[in-house]
């Protein structure tokens, strides 16, 4: 079955609303995760730390430049994801509609490209890297 990523996006306002009712949000999210586990569709789920604690590595010239925090012009921030194994985009959308999100949040639904859809040299590079990592030689 295809895999779909449900990408949780929020704004400063929606994140503030979420933090105002964090205990309730955690409880309802746990119930939602249990539903997905019972249905056998959940592969992974993670929430991200505050974007102010992250860094951005920007490739704009000869050497990468590292800056604190998210992009300056970003209005929506990637807050976390659910990775699902479902039959179709429509099924992924139905799960996305059930996410206990606060007003102002958005859920982006994206299919994960299969290995057979990658350019030939990319797929080989992934296999080579996996083999190198298993031996400790990169």
PLM regions: where:
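Conserved, structured core segments of small domains
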Residues: 1-138
């Amino acid at each position: 079955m295809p895999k779909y990523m449900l990408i949780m996006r929020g704004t400063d306002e929606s994140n503030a609303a979420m933090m105002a009712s964090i205990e309730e949000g955690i409880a309802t999210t746990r119930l939602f995760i249990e539903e997905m586990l019972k249905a056998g569709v959940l592969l992974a789920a993670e929430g991200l730390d505050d974007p102010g604690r992250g860094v951005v590595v920007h490739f704009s010239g000869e050497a990468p430049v590292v800056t604190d925090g998210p992009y300056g012009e970003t209005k929506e921030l990637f807050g976390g994801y659910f990775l699902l194994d479902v039959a179709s985009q429509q099924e992924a959308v139905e799960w996305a509609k059930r996410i206990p999100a606060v007003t102002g949040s958005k859920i982006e639904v994206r299919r994960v490209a299969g290995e057979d859809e990658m350019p030939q040299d990319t797929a080989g590079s992934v296999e080579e890297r996996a083999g190198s990592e298993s031996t400790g030689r990169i």
